[in-house]
């Protein structure tokens, strides 16, 4: 039940900006550590303002650390994924990750700034939720939530309570 509540809270609030308390940064540092164990200390995460109401992220470097900026946790996680793909030539997927990273991560060649298209980025379907996700344990749910955040998803299908309407 505890994990169910955590998943519900994450899904409900993942698209909302969090300012001040460091909650978004902590969540993304934890995500980085899960995806690339031992590398989180090579990143610096910073919150920035949205651009004209749209989610935005930046990838930069300061010569020592990789700087990821975003207006919420999903934007920061998306910046992390962009950095892995286009600077490290690494890949994170459902079917196995390609993460052969050097001990010292490379600096981005240039500062990259991206606006994430669409206010709501939808993901999942009833088959996934009904036939597959029902068998997931907490680690598998955490992997899926990380994957969603890294791919800018802020509106996953969440059908809890729908059976109450149907029946």
Residue ranges and their predicted role:
Residues 43-47:
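Generic structural signal for residues in well-ordered beta-strands
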Residues 12, 54-61:
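Short, flexible, solvent-exposed loop/turn segments with mixed acidic/basic and small polar residues
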Residues 4-14:
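Sec-dependent N-terminal signal peptides
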Residues 23, 31, 37, 48-52, ...:
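Feature activates predominantly on carbohydrate-active enzymes
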Residues 18-22:
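Boundary at the C-terminal end of the N-terminal hydrophobic targeting segment
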């Amino acid at each position: 039940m505890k994990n169910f509540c955590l998943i519900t809270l994450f899904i409900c609030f993942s698209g909302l900006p969090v300012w001040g308390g460091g909650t978004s940064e902590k969540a993304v540092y934890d995500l980085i550590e899960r995806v690339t164990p031992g590398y989180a200390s090579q990143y610096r995460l910073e919150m920035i303002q949205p651009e004209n109401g749209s989610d935005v992220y930046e990838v930069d470097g300061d010569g020592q650390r990789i700087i990821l900026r975003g207006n919420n946790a999903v934007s920061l996680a998306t910046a992390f994924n962009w950095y892995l793909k286009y600077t490290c030539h690494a890949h994170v997927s459902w079917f196995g990750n390609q993460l052969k990273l050097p001990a010292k991560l490379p600096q981005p060649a240039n500062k990259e700034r991206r606006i994430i298209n669409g206010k709501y980025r939808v993901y999942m379907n009833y088959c996934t939720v009904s036939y597959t996700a029902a068998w997931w344990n907490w680690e598998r749910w955490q992997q899926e939530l990380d994957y969603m955040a890294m791919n800018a998803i802020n509106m996953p299908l969440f059908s809890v309570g729908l059976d109450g309407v149907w029946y």
